[in-house]
């Protein structure tokens, strides 16, 4: 019986150490690894050999926080949570024609800025 208690104690200690290490990382440390930084990446659909087309792709930040009481009083429809986010957008671009008559923006530089067009 003492034999099994020792194994149970070792398992519990190992589990608690693992959970301590897991909770010591800042929030989002593991999820950010899947999300690349905001920069121009080649658009395979519009690119041709020798004439690549680049589009801004990547992640920026978003956050939500409680709406301040002073701000709530000015809202027509009061909301308890306020959110803000930035999107990966082109800082500079050139317009080019592809496939004969399709006008496409070739992004040359990207940055995180206000989101104007939200993707669903």
Swiss-Prot record:
Sorted keywords for this record are:
Disulfide bond, Glycoprotein, Hormone, Secreted, Signal
- Database matches in InterPro entries: Cystine-knot_cytokine (IPR029034), Glyco_hormone (IPR000476)
Listed GO CC annotations: extracellular space; follicle-stimulating hormone complex
Protein localization: Secreted
The residues that carry sugar chains are 80, 106
Pfam families reported for this sequence: Hormone_6
- PROSITE patterns this protein is in? GLYCO_HORMONE_ALPHA_1, GLYCO_HORMONE_ALPHA_2, GLYCO_HORMONE_ALPHA_3
Q: Which GO terms describe its biological process?
A: G protein-coupled receptor signaling pathway; positive regulation of steroid biosynthetic process; regulation of signaling receptor activity; thyroid hormone generation
Identify the main location: secreted
Give the signal peptide, or none: 1-24
Asked if the keyword Glycoprotein belongs to this entry, the reply reads: yes
**What's a Gene Ontology MF term here?**
follicle-stimulating hormone activity
| Disulfide bond annotation, renumbered to this chain | 35-59, 38-88, 56-110, 60-112, 87-115
Subunit text: Heterodimer. The active hormones thyrotropin, lutropin, follitropin and choriogonadotropin are heterodimers composed of CGA, a common alpha chain described here and a unique beta chain which confers their biological specificity to the hormones: TSHB for thyrotropin, LHB for lutropin, FSHB for follitropin and choriogonadotropin subunit beta/CGB for choriogonadotropin.
Can you tell me which family this protein belongs to? Belongs to the glycoprotein hormones subunit alpha family.
Function of this protein? Shared alpha chain of the active heterodimeric glycoprotein hormones thyrotropin/thyroid stimulating hormone/TSH, lutropin/luteinizing hormone/LH, follitropin/follicle stimulating hormone/FSH and choriogonadotropin/CG. These hormones bind specific receptors on target cells that in turn activate downstream signaling pathways.
Q: What is this protein called?
A: Glycoprotein hormones alpha chain
